[in-house]
């Protein structure tokens, strides 16, 4: 009986663990952050998981992975601060970024200075996204492309994924929080992906495998002791 319970626990554990792993691999794409332009949210060299989504699912405040030939040959990570039809400008008399006249508090921005060391105003075209790094004093982002035809915006179709969590190094691992400042704006903020569910599924599977592997020898030993 003990052997059957042990085998069942290991089998179920394998199902949960492999199923969770496959689920995560289907939903998420891992990326290594190449620069510190998104510090302190994610730093250079950190490993993140980005949920595969289409551009139509992007909301203000999302940290996205995108590819635009006009910005370079490699995928880039930036934060969406404005979407199609928005007017974005910086800075007000308190040094804050404004979207459609609404000033934003941005606790994720690195440093204590203004939201941007360079003042700017831009109108985001339809199906466009205006992107800024969280380390505003050194990030190369939409501000570097204000003279382009789309005033620094990229198309929604350039988005490949949305960053949901940091997974390496372990000391900085955790979910990327959706900014409260954008919550009351039209469209609100995006919902977190299934990161926690994937993690718990894999964890439950690993726990069942371990419990079954440990319980089996004890059950067999107990059976031998009880035999005549």
Task: Please identify what each model-predicted range represents.
Residues 1-228:
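Extended hydrophobic leader/signal-anchor segments used for secretion and membrane insertion
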């Amino acid at each position: 009986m003990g052997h059957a319970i042990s085998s069942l626990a290991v089998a179920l554990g394998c199902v949960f663990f492999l199923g969770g792993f496959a689920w995560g691999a289907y939903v998420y794409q891992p990326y290594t952050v190449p620069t510190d332009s998104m510090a302190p949210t994610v730093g250079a060299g950190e490993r993140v998981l980005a949920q595969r989504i289409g551009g139509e699912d992007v909301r203000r405040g999302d940290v996205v992975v995108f590819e635009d030939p006009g910005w370079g040959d490699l995928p880039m990570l930036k934060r969406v601060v404005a979407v199609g039809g928005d007017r974005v400008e910086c800075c007000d008399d308190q040094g804050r970024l404004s979207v459609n006249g609404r000033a934003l508090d941005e606790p994720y921005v690195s440093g204590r200075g203004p939201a941007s060391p360079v003042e700017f105003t831009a109108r985001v075209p339809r199906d466009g996204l205006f992107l800024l790094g969280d380390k505003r004093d050194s990030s190369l982002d939409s501000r570097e492309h204000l003279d382009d035809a789309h005033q620094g915006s990229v198309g929604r179709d350039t988005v490949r994924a949305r960053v949901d969590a940091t997974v390496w190094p372990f000391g900085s691992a955790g979910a990327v929080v959706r900014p409260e400042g954008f919550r009351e704006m039209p469209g609100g903020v995006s919902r977190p992906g299934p990161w926690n569910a994937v993690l718990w599924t894999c964890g439950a599977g690993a726990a069942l495998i371990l419990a079954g592997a440990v319980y089996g020898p004890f059950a067999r030993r107990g059976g031998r002791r009880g035999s005549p």
